[in-house]
């Protein structure tokens, strides 16, 4: 009976008494007060920089370093306008933050923007990487593994605009760390270019794969999209041409100066034929020059183990499939040239005549491509 009475009280309409105000609900909030400032705990106030008084001491550098770390999170903002403005901000600050510890955080957060959905963000990222390379190319070289990973992601991306813009990033990277890129991902990058351009690879290997065309997984819609965008196709052709010249003919072949000014009369100032003869006997310019031998790694390709358990050292890459080529190290120019001539040269040669016949920017680039292929054949392996 008591519970029934309590329930009825909830539905009873209270009677208003004369001279008394209306009773307020129990959960009412008093809004009669005034505040002079509002606290936003989810946002951080960022200063305009360490100019003037604090720029000359360690406190200014520390503040600038913390400011960069706070701004880096905006590169993952849901708004493409915010991401673009953040990239523009970092581009204007590169000269001051290029040697700060927070530069590593910036690179790790900005490189994934190669696959960003916004065209404007990707364009500004290319300008940012170019600015970083102009100030200190070693920053890009230290991040070559991450750069290679996201370059391949962009080349194989399901969204056609992201795939088309991959050549833009390749050209920027080749300007400052061409040698590192070709040594690290020679075969993967070549396969990626074939996928971006919609070409097929005709294998020239063993009897099982002889005369077999391997599609690179390009859909008809992406090929039509690339054909409609002649400008992007030309940019990817240029990127592929520069990449092949850097890998087969040397870093100096792409038209950029050597990164070491003390070697002006060294390897990069002579012809590629002389370069390949004596460069292997010079002191290497990069760390771990013999890592391609895999002396301290246990990695064997399928079917390359003998009965004694030792790995066969066959240098004939023509008998290897495209899947087995992934395990082949391409640290030296000789191996890269051999792999290119046996697996990629015939497929490229089949595509160039049609491009030259079409004319235009793509035709001129294809003509330069054809001249480069003839130059590669003239080099005695």
From Swiss-Prot:
Gene Ontology terms: biological process: rRNA processing
Top-level division of the source organism's lineage: Eukaryota
Subunit text: Component of the RIX1 complex, composed of IPI1, RIX1/IPI2 and IPI3 in a 1:2:2 stoichiometry. The complex interacts (via RIX1) with MDN1 (via its hexameric AAA ATPase ring) and the pre-60S ribosome particles.
Gene Ontology CC entries for this record: nucleus; rixosome complex
Annotated stretches, region: Disordered: 1-32
Family: Belongs to the IPI1/TEX10 family.
Composition-biased stretches (Basic residues): 14-23
Species the sequence originates in: Kluyveromyces lactis (strain ATCC 8585 / CBS 2359 / DSM 70799 / NBRC 1267 / NRRL Y-1140 / WM37) (Yeast)
Purpose of the protein: Component of the RIX1 complex required for processing of ITS2 sequences from 35S pre-rRNA.
Lineage: Eukaryota, Fungi, Dikarya, Ascomycota, Saccharomycotina
Main subcellular location: nucleus
Protein's recorded name: Pre-rRNA-processing protein IPI1
Presence of the UniProt keyword Ligase in the record: no
InterPro entries membership: ARM-type_fold (IPR016024), Ipi1_N (IPR024679)
